[in-house]
Amino acid sequence: NGEFWGKSEAYLHKQAFQMFGLIDEALTQNPPVVGAPMVRKLALFNLDAMLHETKYDNTEPFNNFVDSRMQKLLVELNNPVKKGLKIFKVYNDGFIARTQSTTIAFDIVRGSIQGKEIVSEECIKQIVEHCDILFITHNHGDHADRLVADLFIEAGKPVIVPTNIWPDDKAIQHLRSDEIIDKEIALKNGKKLQVKILPGHQSELMNNIYVVTTEEKKTIVQTGDQYHKEDINWLMNIHQKTPRPDALLVNCWTNRMNDLIEGFAPKFVITGHENEMGHTIDHREAFWLTFQKMEEIKRNYVVMGWGEWFLCK
């Protein structure tokens, strides 16, 4: 069949539909589990290969893939959690943590490539409807999205940020200290969260590490972009001051990964920040790199793509 002879770009464009489609299907049929099963590694490594080829940025095959992943996430968000803690990975370091009583959002953003949004505004609106509160770790555009924060505020839901994010906005709760903050936060639905805020950093930038415990006594830690050589000295023993996390959400390129993980001693570790598409390809962190690091880790770890979820039992 000579359909593509002499038309290499059209050929690769068609191939991209096939690749993204098959990756989507493989991830759907093989949902996240602890460890590194071959089929998931193959799917995620192939996703790396596609996402590190910038010719596919903002193309129809890429957009279809993202939309498909997000639609699956939205369908699953319609199913209440009866028991345990379910963690959803949205995009980049954006996560949703859900128990029977509460749905918590961390660092949810639309994301963008050259100014074009990745996750649609319509999808974000539906996510916000499901969530009770938004925590933002630090003042970078791939973690803090004004549109997302405004949707929470309009819905009368709390938005928690460090003091250097939108500092003049009185509708937002600004929380940051050099000491550990210990706070109870009341939600619109009448539920309460116990929250500890640790004074982390990404280099010199303040990076709040949130330790959030629900009424079911399920604890989630979101470390944001924690990366600081001095902080690790106190983080290595932080489990003495915090409840044991059911899920530790850790960025895949953090400083001294194993020391940070052992410092919290979590039941499950879930990585974030792979393939942040606003970056050049050298900092679109690869899933193959994440697996390389996590295979050294003694704790239960789970590596997820966009629009996936895992029930921590």
Place the predicted regions along the sequence by residue.
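Active-site neighborhood of phospho(di)ester-bond hydrolases with catalytic His/Asp-centered motifs
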Residues: 105-109, 130-144, 160-164, 221-226, ...
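Short, polar loop motifs at secondary-structure junctions
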Residues: 91-93, 161-168, 253-256
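C-terminal regulatory/interaction regions
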Residues: 1-50, 285-313
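Beta-strand-turn-beta hairpins that frame and shape the catalytic cleft
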Residues: 80-86, 98-104, 183-196, 213-220, ...
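Pre-active-site segment of Zn-dependent metallo-hydrolases
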Residues: 1-33, 64-83, 90, 94-135, ...
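Active-site-proximal loop/helix segments of hydrolase catalytic cores
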Residues: 147, 198-265
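Active-site HxH/HxHxD metal-binding segment of metal-dependent hydrolases
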Residues: 121-181
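Binuclear metal-ion centers of metallo-dependent hydrolases, dominated by the metallo-beta-lactamase
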Residues: 1, 171-194, 201-204, 214, ...
